[in-house]
Amino acid sequence: MTRAALGPLLLALALRPAAGQLVAVGPQFVLADYREVASGLRYRGNGFGGTLWARRNRFSVEAAVVRLSFDPVAGSAADSGFTATQVDAWVAYDVAAYASIEVGVLHRSVDPEFDAQSVGAVRVGARSFYQIGPGATVVFRANYLAAPKFSGGGHAAVSLDLGLGLDVRLAGRLHGTATYAFNRMNRRTNPGGTGEIDAPIQETVARLGLALGF
């Protein structure tokens, strides 16, 4: 098969309606804002990533990976940037036609290691989804981030991740996706053993992408 023939064939497969669609995968462009509130550190960044979603009966899995480059904003106490790789994953079970309960993980690694906080946490929460029009679905997610671990130490009794998403079927198997997530970890540290102080961390992540269903 020639390259000239292969291109139209792949396009036709992408645009053909999918019966019983179970898997979707695609690229994402990402914008992010990261703050360590007490120390006056604030960064903005962007990058690229990918997402995978799969469903079988009432169960579904979702994963997203992104690589971000951050730079300090005006007025930040930071004088240099860093890169971060973030992995988000969920396993969900539908309890109703419009709602699921879910568990998962959040993992963010940072380079250079101590320019910002690397974080790992377990997700426990729920999501709801509503069809707002033909081929268009809006999703709201709320997760408690349990047992977070920080590269710089400390603990956080209250950590939340909230998300809003939109999925629009553009043509057949091809979807457009947009998500916005906000998480805040009310971290506390005890530097030098002199007593605990507040050191909260918050991050916002906006993703815009395409997904191809199979």
Tell me what each language-model feature is.
Residues F29-R35, R56-R58, V65-D71, V105-D111, ...:
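Transmembrane beta-strands of outer-membrane beta-barrel pores
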Residues P27, G50-R56, A89-Y93, V105, ...:
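Residues on the lipid-exposed face of transmembrane beta-strands in outer-membrane beta-barrel proteins
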Residues R35-Y43, D71-F82, D111-V119, K149-L160, ...:
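Outer-membrane beta-barrel translocator domains and adjoining extracellular loop/strand segments
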Residues R42-F48, R55, G81-V87, A97, ...:
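Residues that define the transmembrane beta-barrel architecture of outer-membrane proteins
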Residues A18-G75, V205-F214:
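Short glycine/proline- and aromatic-enriched beta-strand/turn motifs that initiate or cap beta-hairpins
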Residues A156-F214:
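Predominantly the C-terminal beta-signal and adjacent terminal strand-loop region
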Residues V23-A24, N57-A63, A97-I101, G133-V138, ...:
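Repeated loop/turn-to-beta-strand initiation elements of outer-membrane beta-barrel proteins
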